């Protein structure tokens, strides 16, 4: 990597920084930068500061999420409140404003499809005008809207939420799961992202972590995390491929594992290819068949579509282990002739035919990744499968045909990523000392130069963290400011790539064009997020450049979302407190009434009536429980319990005295009998 960098620097250095390209002389009004000599500086900084407390590893998935922590040298996947090791990445808002996360949200999706958000990870860090987003708007029942900054947000009951907020609500559930297990606050986290996520998507994921109250120590790539889970206890040196086909994204990474060093050689993928697309393809097939048989079009009925969507997902999963499944949805819809039921058989071969194009889309990225890593399939010692979709036999066969070997099933495809994130958390905390992770940036990073050309500063598959600099000059006489547009992608023209942000450097002393020397430095951190600084070499004065990104969340946005998340957390705490108090009160009422019936002969009638009045008051309080605090309900329940205990204490004393009287009376009679016998 170093030698390649030096070679690139040697080729580029030599054009005098004071010269301006001829093209600059023919473009009046150009306020950007001329393309001048390069100076590259490479930096690798893998050390981390000591972290206090546990670091949780979170796989924030498109369909499901998972959380793990290190216990000694082993990572442990944690069960949520429902007893499951994975949590659906689903968030819903009910009509009364209640927020549901995970399985409770997924269960009510059929009756509340317009306000139940799923697969929002596909929207994170994306613009509303992105073709993929526009495609998604036609496939989901909830509203995807254009935010004021042009990003894609979602809407429920008239309120707008950023995808980062929805992700934060899922992360809060993961955080709560970890805290319930640890018994204390979980503050630090490592969160995973698809390897092919760009800078905006990575930053938006970090924002989600911040909104949820987590300190995100590192954002790492999902295939890399899975490789850590696979190779932590392996001593053999080898090159492996990680084929990760999850709910919403596809990644392929080629890694070399050597004596505890996990070096990513290349990565590739598709951030809009996953299980959701397989579900959607099957849904379209079912809807088409239903219309052919009944003449009824289901596309306008969101509730019916949600039922079909859930049935499609279930059928997809069943066909991984069965060769045929039945899809039965009674009373799916109705027309003038009456109710309509959906009954159809689906074979594995039929399903494979429906999704064959989706599976084929994973082949080209795999071939490109091997080409970039300069390895052939014979060099790869193991192929690891990650993501729920890799359970599909046709996917496994495709992988085997592609790499010439049967894929390994050494890791759990649903849990490996979270386990790897926890291991990386252990590395950062200093608990795991024999592992070094060298990841790469998935996409080239550069700037727009004269004529709209995309000039690459950092090439794709460069090991991160890395730091590179380039010297620029002005393109016009007397120019006092320059505009720098930072882009990410592989196209030759800047306009065809993803615009990450633009910077304006002001305060340049007026001088003839080509004279000022402005050194712009791009610093790509271990999270794959870029930071930029600039220095006027003539004056030695360093300027701070703030990204004027056209999208993304501002600092104020994030602070407001943090407050909203805290508000929801407080509401959740109050709700939980109220539910626990209601359960306690209902238990006390039940126990009191049972004991009153059991001891009715021993209890004074007037005291019983008083207690019955207390129970009636308690029931009245429970009838308006939604407007009462948990503390009020708990206090009232405690008062009822104290009153009942006093009454039952009287009953016990009465019963005890009666038993004693009965016992002494029996003893006296026995003595008289013995006396008579002796006489």
Swiss-Prot record:
For the region Substrate-binding domain (SBD), what residue ranges are annotated? 442-679
Q: What is the species listed in this Swiss-Prot or TrEMBL entry?
A: Cricetulus griseus
Task: Give the sites modified to Phosphothreonine.
Answer: 87
Query: What family does this chain come from, according to its entry?
Result: Belongs to the heat shock protein 70 family.
Q: What is this protein called?
A: Stress-70 protein, mitochondrial
Omega-N-methylarginine PTM sites in chain numbering:
513
Q: Where is this region: Interaction with FXN and ISCU?
A: 432-679
Location of the region described as Interaction with NFS1 in the Swiss-Prot/TrEMBL record: 1-432
A single GO molecular-function term is: ATP-dependent protein folding chaperone
PROSITE patterns cross-referenced by the UniProt entry: HSP70_1, HSP70_2, HSP70_3
Q: Name one GO biological process term.
A: negative regulation of hemopoiesis
Per UniProt, subunit arrangement is:
Interacts strongly with the intermediate form of FXN and weakly with its mature form. Interacts with HSCB. Associates with the mitochondrial contact site and cristae organizing system (MICOS) complex, composed of at least MICOS10/MIC10, CHCHD3/MIC19, CHCHD6/MIC25, APOOL/MIC27, IMMT/MIC60, APOO/MIC23/MIC26 and QIL1/MIC13. This complex was also known under the names MINOS or MitOS complex. The MICOS complex associates with mitochondrial outer membrane proteins SAMM50, MTX1, MTX2 and DNAJC11, mitochondrial inner membrane protein TMEM11 and with HSPA9.
Q: Cellular component per GO?
A: cytoplasm; mitochondrial matrix; mitochondrion; nucleolus
